[in-house]
Amino acid sequence: MKNRFRIILAGLLAFACMTSKADEGMWLPSLISQRITDMQAKGFRLNAEDIYSINEASLKDAVVLFGRGCTGELVSPEGLLLTNHHCGYGQIQKHSSVEHDYLKDGFWAMSRAEELPNKGLTVSFLERMEDVTDAVLNGYEPSMSEEQRVEIVKNNSKAIIDEAVKEGKGLRATVEALYYGNQYFLFLYREYADVRLVGAPPSSIGKFGGDTDNWMWPRHTGDFSMFRVYADKDNNPAEYSEDNVPYRPKKYFRISTKGVQEGDFTFIYGFPGRTQEYIHSEGVRYIEETGDPHKIALRTLRLDIMNRHQSQS
């Protein structure tokens, strides 16, 4: 999947009580029923429909696409949302000034009136996902060129999207290619545009260790920020207005103070950027024998140039 494809996936890190080996894998929530028996055997206490359901409230209704590339989760019945500090960094920066340096000092709204609006920021709730492979490839023949295939996929996808967003207010849809174009899914979202900053720690906490620590484990970063989603009086999406009220989620996460124990079942629900877990063998061969060697050569050349100029300065 390309980086621009922000597709909701359940990444399973299931820990059996007798071992510490992670089962791993990335799974579409709509297909999680194929894994539920194994998950329950490892300690999961819910059903597949508790994770993903289009008819009843489920965990999917508490997990949101924050902006266009981050994951957030609802943690209160009044629209309070938790996401990463780096995901809210742009909004924190926009509200900062010389007098109020929220990046340096942090920010906490002491009342609803102090929460800060963020023009252009949206939060998207997944309504449903649907396999539309047959509809997307309708009219395609194996004898056609790649350019013809791309055109057919684009036109069919647009028609599917246009039809899907007619279903209600505030809907946004995408058609995404999975498994390198072998399968296509429609993702239908309900998008809320009134999202207000509630709180964030100082960058010395929220960005502690920077990008270096971002790729390390364990981490010691307070990488979080808090926002609140607002809606109109009928709980529907609406542009920013002082008349809007906190969104009432179908589902939200209750935060436990009990902590976790070794062997507890764990899984991650969110919007990862991309995965190459299912890349084919020739793709791996290309990375190993062609892509990476060229990258190493280019970066070595750049470092040589930098080092030469540094030694002369």
Feature annotation, model-predicted:
Residues 1-24:
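Bacterial Sec-dependent N-terminal signal peptides
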Residues 18-313:
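Terminal presequence/propeptide segments associated with secretion/organelle targeting
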